[in-house]
A protein has these predicted regions:
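Zinc-dependent deaminase catalytic domain
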Residues: 1-129
Length: 129
């Protein structure tokens, strides 16, 4: 098992913590020595009522797994994000600002083309496993 597969297997376990009935996303950040720095999953912010039945509320308030993982690291501390789903463009911008240079993921979104172009501009390698 290589480091990409290792990190992605952890992300898949972390995703199971999400209470989102439509999409459970998990993310893991690896440091330069391949130790796990942080994990995150998609969900409502702490102390907020979790109303998964309202699509608009869910879309407006849910914090993405990648953002939840980034809250626990310093910029340039990590090089790799493993996510069960390809990050959205907003998450990709945040990941670039933290110095992430490699993203491994399992599932994709319909917005893949714009995400691929943005990742290329940020010099981030996207690897679909």
């Amino acid at each position: 098992m290589n480091w990409d597969e290792y990190a992605l297997s952890i992300a898949e376990v972390v995703a199971k913590k999400s209470k989102d009935p439509w999409r459970q996303v998990g993310a893991v950040l690896l440091r330069h020595d391949n130790t796990v720095a942080a994990c995150g999953y998609n969900g409502f912010p702490p102390h907020m009522e979790e109303d998964w039945s309202c699509r608009d509320k869910r879309r407006n308030y849910v914090v993405h797994a990648e953002q939840n993982a980034l809250r626990h690291v310093r910029p340039l501390e990590c090089y790799l994000l493993a996510s069960t789903t390809l990050p959205c463009n907003d998450c990709l911008k945040s990941l670039a600002s933290y110095g992430i240079k490699r993203i491994v993921y399992r599932e994709t979104y319909p917005t893949d083309e714009s995400t691929t172009l943005l990742a290329s501009e940020f010099n981030i390698a996207l690897i679909n496993v």
